[in-house]
Amino acid sequence: MDPSALQNMDRDALKKQIENMKYQANMERWPLSKSIAEMRSFVEENEKNDPLINAPDKKNNPWAEKGKCVIM
């Protein structure tokens, strides 16, 4: 970090930044291959319940239009 930036930061901001750096240093790291495999399995498991992929039944949808408006 630039020394001039440290002079402009107050003590509380520096403490927060140190806490954040400690948190990030203690995070469990996964190889990308493991992360991709986990994400893929999650998507495949939850694909059945995703309303954007499998649209819900229109009969049970309270916001779906019931019929067309006829004027006459």
UniProtKB/Swiss-Prot annotation:
A lipid is attached at C69 (S-farnesyl cysteine). It is found in: Cell membrane; Cytoplasm; Cell projection, Axon; Cell projection, Rhabdomere. It is a lipid-anchor. The keyword Hydrolase does not apply. Transmembrane segments: none annotated. It comes from the Eukaryota. Belongs to the G protein gamma family. This is Guanine nucleotide-binding protein subunit gamma-e. It comes from Calliphora vicina. The lineage of its organism: Eukaryota, Metazoa, Ecdysozoa, Arthropoda, Hexapoda. The gene is Ggammae.
